[in-house]
Every structure is written in C-alpha cells, then in structure tokens.
C-alpha cells in the first residue's frame, strides 16, 4: 500500500471513530432522563427521627428531609407527591446511592470530605449546630446569663464521649449531666435538675414547637455542620438539576414551599429572598 493510500485509510478510520463518538455519548443517559421516563422520584430517607423523617399519626412519612424530596419531585413533574420513599438506616445512605437503589438520599446527612469521595453532595439545605434551651420562666434569661453564672449552671446532654467537651466549648465552667436518652435530658430541665439542655438546634426547635411558650432558645449556637442531599458521582446533569430545584426553593419561585416547611418543623419564619441583585453572588 502506498503512503497516500495508507494516509487515506487512516483518515477514513479516524473519521469513522469520531463520527461514532457523539452517538456513544448519547447512549450514556443521565439519571435525570431515567427519572423522567419512570414518572416518579425514588428517595432514600429514614422514618424515626423528628423533625427530619418520621411517621405521622396516620402512618404517613413526614419531616423536613421528606419535604426536600418533595421539592425535587415538584421540580421534575410539577407534583410533589410523585415520589417513592425507601426506608433506610443511616448506614445504608451511601451504599443505596452507589448501587442505584435510590435516585437521591435526603436524610440529615452531614457533609464531610470522606463522604464526598464516595458520593456527590448537593448544595446545603440546612446548617445544623448545637444549641441551648431554657425554661421560659427559668432563672437564666439567655446565653450571656448562663456564661456569667459559671459553675453554678448545670447542663443536661445526651451521653457520649464528646459531651463534656461539647458543652464546655460554649460554657467552660458549667456542670455537665449526661443522660441515656433525649427524653431524659428534657425531663432534667423540666424538673429543675438542669438549667439548660444542650443538643442539636433542630431538635430544640422542634421540641419548642411542640411545647409553645414553655421553653426558649438561649440565643447561641456552635459546632456547625452542613446537611445536604446525596446523589451518585459522575452525573453532572442530575446533580445540576437537583441543585437548581433546591436553590430555587430557598431563593426563588418555590420559596413559599421551603419556608412553609421550615416553619412547620422548626417554628421559625424565614425572611423572603431580597429582590434585585442575587445575594448569593455578593
């Protein structure tokens, strides 16, 4: 074969390979296309942790995580009820994503570097932290009063190896009483054995909504951690879509849906997004 013929043959082969590449790329469809074709979203979450994901009196799944899934379903189909929930343990959150058992997981999952190597996190939908709850008619008005009281203050907290260090990060001189259940830490405050309860801000907010006027937030939070949904790595179209749905729920056309959920589960009214220049780009 002459040089010119070999060159022509190579050129033809290269052209055939290049022409086939777009078709091959089109075959690798996004999870977005799969979900749209199926007609409903499949979301992994739990069922035993109020106010995030738990059963109502009539056995319906509800909570803030559940509502985040409904936001995505509404963005997909115009209907927040076009969603199937897969009940899963915390340990199953990542495996169920990587094995395609679910399209997405929203289950008060803390964003960490280690987890981000295994799955793709969406934009955050909540910032958790530790807070302090007081009795409304108690002797301490707020966090400043607690801190000023020094060693006179007793704080009830759920028993764990980090409990002392966690409380002392905010109240260095406080006495720390550890209990085996969440119910007991609240009972300690109610009975007067403790002056304050230290636990997740979301748990305190939920408890206060269930007991209006009886308790109050001390006005200080620490130990921040970010909650985000998780999807499978390597599918930018799907990640972009979910991020868009969550972003617009927190800042745009679906804000009322997000704000209503926030009020229901945390008892707080959110300020509507500022009109004009998008604040997230300042």
PLM regions: where:
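Extended ligand-binding regions for polar small-molecule ligands
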Residues: 67-75, 152-153, 161, 226-269
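Periplasmic-binding protein-like
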Residues: 47, 126-137, 201-246, 265-282
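A ligand-binding cleft/hinge motif common to bilobed small-molecule-binding domains
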Residues: 92, 108-118, 168-169, 188-224
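Flexible hinge/capping segments at coil-to-helix
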Residues: 123, 135-154
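Short helix-initiation/N-cap motifs at beta->coil->alpha
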Residues: 30, 83-95, 141, 159, ...
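Ligand-binding cleft/hinge of the Venus flytrap
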Residues: 55-58, 70-81, 147-149, 163-178, ...
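Extracytoplasmic small-molecule ligand-binding "clamshell" domains
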Residues: 26-105, 117, 150
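Beta->alpha turn/N-cap motifs
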Residues: 45-49, 86-91, 100-112, 136, ...
